[in-house]
Amino acid sequence: MKLFVPALLSLGALGLCLAAPRKNVRWCAISLPEWSKCYQWQRRMRKLGAPSITCIRRTSALECIRAIAGKNADAVTLDSGMVFEAGLDPYKLRPVAAEIYGTEKSPQTHYYAVAVVKKGSNFQLDQLQGQKSCHMGLGRSAGWNIPVGILRPFLSWTESAEPLQGAVARFFSASCVPCVDGKAYPNLCQLCKGVGENKCACSSQEPYFGYSGAFKCLQDGAGDVAFVKETTVFENLPEKADRDQYELLCLNNTRAPVDAFKECHLAQVPSHAVVARSVDGKENLIWELLRKAQEKFGKNKSQSFQLFGSPEGRRDLLFKDSALGFVRIPSKVDSALYLGSRYLTALKNLRETAEELKARCTRVVWCAVGPEEQSKCQQWSEQSGQNVTCATASTTDDCIALVLKGEADALSLDGGYIYTAGKCGLVPVMAENRKSSKYSSLDCVLRPTEGYLAVAVVKKANEGLTWNSLKGKKSCHTAVDRTAGWNIPMGLIANQTGSCAFDEFFSQSCAPGADPKSSLCALCAGDDQGLDKCVPNSKEKYYGYTGAFRCLAEDVGDVAFVKNDTVWENTNGESSADWAKNLNREDFRLLCLDGTTKPVTEAQSCYLAVAPNHAVVSRSDRAAHVEQVLLHQQALFGKNGKNCPDQFCLFKSETKNLLFNDNTECLAKLGGRPTYEKYLGTEYVTAIANLKKCSTSPLLEACAFLTR
């Protein structure tokens, strides 16, 4: 079976070099039958040589999680619900390998939880109250946890007063929820079809139990909606004409055909995963063990021992019997990224109080990059009356990850990062709009975005330096992966040279976010104490537009890649910063692609490319709310806001361009909720995609895994 690309296999082989001298993995078994299978596995692996396996027995998945966190075991396989538990404090375990299901031609590492209804029934997801519901079983992901978690805001549930089942029983007019206590909650068993003691039973003795049972409950007309997984409809209705009689309820309160489950689902549920410690977790060794084990004992590999099989009368020991193999999970993926925001939200909704849930739904959590942005964000939060609160990360990629996990809601990004965020599933919400002579008569909020000019700036005194003579010079960049400072100039250079060896093109550089040991970080300065050199946030003195221009102004670099406004904002007395207050605009020139140079006043005829405006991004399910809150916030704290400058200004910073660009006039609406490709434009997306062939980022690798 060929389920692994060479890159994944080579990553597994890397464990040979990086593993501890004693190549042993302590596997945690949660029962005597599991321990017995583990012992059989141990014996067979011993014959193959390293890595070896030792079997540790505990009484439950939670006990295994504790053993791994306490360094008394190394690995265990968990379902998605327990992966969530394992990722919480104090355990902080992360998934390192995922089980693969499906077929060799169509391998899957997740399924979709969906709400199925009959075509012609006249209600949407937010109109389910009073309808009749069919569930596969109490406590099951697709049949209970996810739909009930998503419906939680509509439930009249006081946590301390009653169990959740009581609120669900009142919400639906009648239900079939196998495994529930029918005496305590008769309404939740009312639609079930089992006879006598088998009514509402937690087994196939109840005809409406399980995925197919819940769908049959809908088919028979007993219920109005069935909560199942996407394959259930296809398995029970192989003919398209029959499937066309059913539809899916979408989170945006619309309906879609049953084959549109990738766009219309309640949540994506990942497969079972092997978890390990986040620090000193032996993940390379664990992957080597799994890779060798599946090669020798995987599907149809061995009669004497089957890794994905259990003795008669037993099921899913150590791994699911239906698994085909494993795929390695990228190191950037923690438990929250693995589970996804929709699934996480559903689980959180089942745990939080009504007050916590309301607060989370109404506020917007903004992600600040670095301490200076955090400080400004805290001021914003205080002035907003906590309508906006703050999360903080050390890099933009880490902020994007927080939004993906639902730990933050939004941030404003440069076009290069919009590309990354878009590849990860986030969407543009509003654009930073500057003053415009072309559309001066239009309301800024409704005005089309015009983009900005990416330029290469040099000192006038550096005579003879042109675009064609940059090789071997010293360069200043806003940050790796940013538009004007990296993507545009380095994309042009890569196209001209046919090489991705950027560290060899320039003699030295400051490109925050690059490898600190490389020449691309040689010119960076860090903070006032010389710490955090080359970090992609405001701790690095030469980070961002202003930082890259300062790098040039202080004669550290020969050329700065910035936007055309940067020179104007930091010369001729426009900036009060000590390093900039005496700078003259006439002392700088622009490099044109034709090999000439021009004054900075002639940027319209001497630029590298037109770059898309910075834009706010969020998850699609939060986009409308983020826009609503931002419109209100800029009415208070925008350029012409009633509380700016007296209390707080969104588009003004003590240093430069914190949270938003300082030259932003307003945040503008984006008509029709465009995709990231449409917002950035085909040419720009193609250019970045080509540049990413030179090098990708851990976050892009993680998102490629999560969205495949």
Curated annotation (Swiss-Prot):
Active site per database record: K92, S278
A Gene Ontology term for the protein's cellular component: plasma membrane
Pfam family, one: Transferrin
Binding site for Fe(3+) 1: D79, Y111, Y211, H272
First-tier enzyme category under EC: hydrolase
GO biological process: antibacterial humoral response; antifungal humoral response; bone morphogenesis; innate immune response in mucosa; iron ion transport; negative regulation of apoptotic process; negative regulation of lipopolysaccharide-mediated signaling pathway; negative regulation of osteoclast development
Residues with attached carbohydrate: N252, N300, N387, N495, N564
UniProt-listed CDD domains: PBP2_transferrin_C, PBP2_transferrin_N
Enzyme Commission numbers on file: 3.4.21.-
Cysteine pairs bridged by disulfides in the record: C28-C64, C38-C55, C134-C217, C176-C192, C179-C202, C189-C200, C250-C264, C367-C399, C377-C390, C424-C703, C444-C666, C476-C551, C500-C694, C510-C524, C521-C534, C592-C606, C644-C649
Annotated Fe(3+) 2 binding sites: D414, Y452, Y545, H614
Residue sites binding hydrogencarbonate 1 per the record: R140, A142, G143
Localisation: Secreted; Cytoplasmic granule
Signal peptide boundaries: 1-19
Keyword Hydrolase found: yes
Database matches in SMART domains: TR_FER
GO molecular function: metal ion binding; serine-type peptidase activity
Described purpose of this protein according to its UniProt entry: Transferrins are iron binding transport proteins which can bind two Fe(3+) ions in association with the binding of an anion, usually bicarbonate.
Subunit comment: Monomer. Found in a complex with LTF, CLU, EPPIN and SEMG1. Found in a complex with MPO and LTF; interacts directly with CP, allows Fe(3+) incorporation into LTF and activation of CP ferroxidase activity.
Family per similarity comment: Belongs to the transferrin family.
UniProt name for this protein: Lactotransferrin
Provenance organism: Capra hircus (Goat)
Gene behind the chain: LTF
